[in-house]
Amino acid sequence: MPSPALLCCCLVLLAGVGASRHQSTLSEDDCTHFPASLPHMLRELRAAFGRVKTFFQMKDKLDNILLTGSLLEDFKGYLGCQALSEMIQFYLEEVMPRAENHDPDIKDHVNSLGEKLKTLRLRLRRCHRFLPCENKSKAVEQVKSAFSKLQEKGVYKAMSEFDIFINYIETYMTMRMKI
């Protein structure tokens, strides 16, 4: 007859296998339903951006465009995955932390926008079909370089064009859903 310790170990092992199998099913289900939930996630991003859009666009006095057509072409091309991944990282790590410090009245709204973008990134990473990439995007490098050259004004420029970024996300995701 097996010892109680051995029985306990077997039960723990079986519970772990069952839980991981259940988790795998949940993850697959999330990915199955992800295309249907994407429009809602994009609406939430747009609504969150709407709370800070006027502030940043009023502060953006520059005539140039940071998020150019070449970035959209990267989103549409074979580098779409990498461009999207890098741009999400760029906004989360470089733009939004600096944007939060510009006015206490918008800090919570920028933070909320960042949390929604993090949620989107997490969902994209879980569903490898949408973010299976490794290569670097030259267009993203150009955006980052232009952003750096603009110094403090770069935050206003990048945040004022966040709606363009949302549109690029939508273009990329729409293309990936057709695959």
Swiss-Prot record:
Q: Which UniProt keywords apply?
A: Cytokine, Disulfide bond, Glycoprotein, Secreted, Signal
GO CC aspect terms: extracellular space
Which GO biological process entries does UniProt record here?
A: branching involved in labyrinthine layer morphogenesis; cellular response to hepatocyte growth factor stimulus; cellular response to lipopolysaccharide; chronic inflammatory response to antigenic stimulus; defense response to bacterium; defense response to protozoan; interleukin-10-mediated signaling pathway; negative regulation of autophagy
Q: Where is this protein primarily located?
A: secreted
Q: Does the keyword Secreted apply?
A: yes
**InterPro entries given in the database record:** 4_helix_cytokine-like_core, IL-10, IL-10/19/20/24/26, IL-10_CS
Give me the glycosylation sites of this protein: 135
Record GO terms (molecular function): cytokine activity; protein dimerization activity
Write out the annotated subcellular location: Secreted
Q: List the disulfide bonds.
A: 31-127, 81-133
Signal peptide range: 1-19
The UniProt family comment states:
Belongs to the IL-10 family.
- Xref: PANTHER family: INTERLEUKIN-10, INTERLEUKIN-19-RELATED
State its role: Major immune regulatory cytokine that acts on many cells of the immune system where it has profound anti-inflammatory functions, limiting excessive tissue disruption caused by inflammation. Mechanistically, IL10 binds to its heterotetrameric receptor comprising IL10RA and IL10RB leading to JAK1 and STAT2-mediated phosphorylation of STAT3. In turn, STAT3 translocates to the nucleus where it drives expression of anti-inflammatory mediators.
Q: How does it assemble?
A: Homodimer. Interacts with IL10RA and IL10RB.
Q: What is this protein called?
A: Interleukin-10
Gene of this entry:
IL10
